[in-house]
Amino acid sequence: MATYTKEKDVETALEDDAEARAAMQEVFSNTARWPAGFGGFTADATANINGVEHKGTVTVKGPKEIETDISDEKAKGFLTENLASIAMHRGPRSFEESDGKYKLHFGDDDTHPLGRKLIMGGDGMSSFYRIKDGRIQQINRQTPRFSFSINIEESRKNQDGKFLTHKYSVFYFNPETKGLKDVESYTDEYTRVGEADLPEKRRIINCEEGQIYVSTMTLSNHKLL
């Protein structure tokens, strides 16, 4: 995904909805995360950016603690950006540290194909989700540079019965004109190491200046730290 800085939380007059909070807490508990005290991992890594391949190793300790010995700047940036995103979403944290800190409120009924709209009151990115069957099916956020919508297409359960997202698409929009800027299609594979589901492969198909680009990140020989 395109990188962005999380906007500061804002004041909100929205009242917290107990039903929405309970639904979001269920979603949170259904999502696979690395175990508490997770120290990170190392792995052999291959970055293939539209046919140009670079190999090396990576060390992942957290979203802001990622190292690789690959010197090519484009491949290094590709690995770092995607591993940071995975570490952020899979990293251990409580509900109160994440979505639970906002005023949660339903924004419509339950007739949308992707589920009910759940508004995150107090979030500085005007975020709202759509949730259905105990899962987030859509994420919508706004930044000064672009707005985006993440649409979940397929999820799989790990050996603990928790969900890992397998396929999803991201639509980027111009915040002023609302015109479509870009589309990215993701496919993720995970491998179980100890009590953690670690990234094994990510494929991204996206359009850029009228051309289709395909990039893959492949990790192997994982070792826990």
List each model region and its residues.
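Ser/Thr- (and often Asn-) enriched beta-sheet segments in non-cytosolic proteins
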Residues: 42-46, 53-59, 67, 117, ...
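An acidic-aromatic
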Residues: 55-148
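Gly/Pro-enriched, hydrophobic low-complexity segments
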Residues: 113-225
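Hydrophobic transmembrane signal anchors and adjacent membrane-proximal interface regions, especially
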Residues: 2-4, 66-68, 212
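N-terminal leader/targeting segments and the immediate start of mature chains
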Residues: 1-50, 71-74, 95-98
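A broad, low-specificity signal for short, low-complexity segments enriched in glycine/proline
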Residues: 3-8, 17-21, 29, 77-80, ...
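Short amphipathic alpha-helical surface micro-motifs
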Residues: 5-6, 22-29, 40, 98-102, ...
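Residue-level signal for secondary-structure boundary sites
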Residues: 51-53, 210
